[in-house]
């Protein structure tokens, strides 16, 4: 197992020129074609890979950050959205937090709009 870890460290430590040479050797000598994007690209910084994932986000959590001055209307909207009872909705509004999890973008934006019209401050995460 130590040999595999060393091999992985060596591969990650390759310069771009060395990685290109490795690709050529694997292709010519062993007939191994790189996958789309290539193994060379996988050695790049993780931050570059994280950016596209954020753009493709399709599910959001609707988070209540502040109930505002008109808590009664916010409680009514929370009950309508979640189906919670009066006490549970009131507790959620007073404590703040996730109103709904893993909601489609369009639905999350609609919920946010309704809650903001009722006087709450809402974030989509």
Swiss-Prot record:
Q: Which organism is it from?
A: Cereibacter sphaeroides (strain ATCC 17023 / DSM 158 / JCM 6121 / CCUG 31486 / LMG 2827 / NBRC 12203 / NCIMB 8253 / ATH 2.4.1.) (Rhodobacter sphaeroides)
Keywords of the record, alphabetical order, are:
Ribonucleoprotein, Ribosomal protein
The UniProt entry's sequence similarity note says:
Belongs to the bacterial ribosomal protein bL12 family.
Q: Which gene encodes it?
A: rplL
Which NCBIfam families does this entry report, sorted A to Z? Answer: L12
Function, as annotated, reads: Forms part of the ribosomal stalk which helps the ribosome interact with GTP-bound translation factors. Is thus essential for accurate translation.
Q: Source organism's superkingdom? A: Bacteria
Task: Indicate the quaternary assembly.
Answer: Homodimer. Part of the ribosomal stalk of the 50S ribosomal subunit. Forms a multimeric L10(L12)X complex, where L10 forms an elongated spine to which 2 to 4 L12 dimers bind in a sequential fashion. Binds GTP-bound translation factors.
Query: Per its UniProt record, what Gene3D superfamilies does this chain match?
Result: 3.30.1390.10, Single helix bin
Q: What is this protein called?
A: Large ribosomal subunit protein bL12
Q: Which GO terms describe its biological process?
A: translation
GO CC annotation: cytosolic large ribosomal subunit
Tell me which Pfam families the record gives.
Ribosomal_L12, Ribosomal_L12_N
User: What GO annotations for molecular function exist for this entry?
Assistant: mRNA binding; structural constituent of ribosome
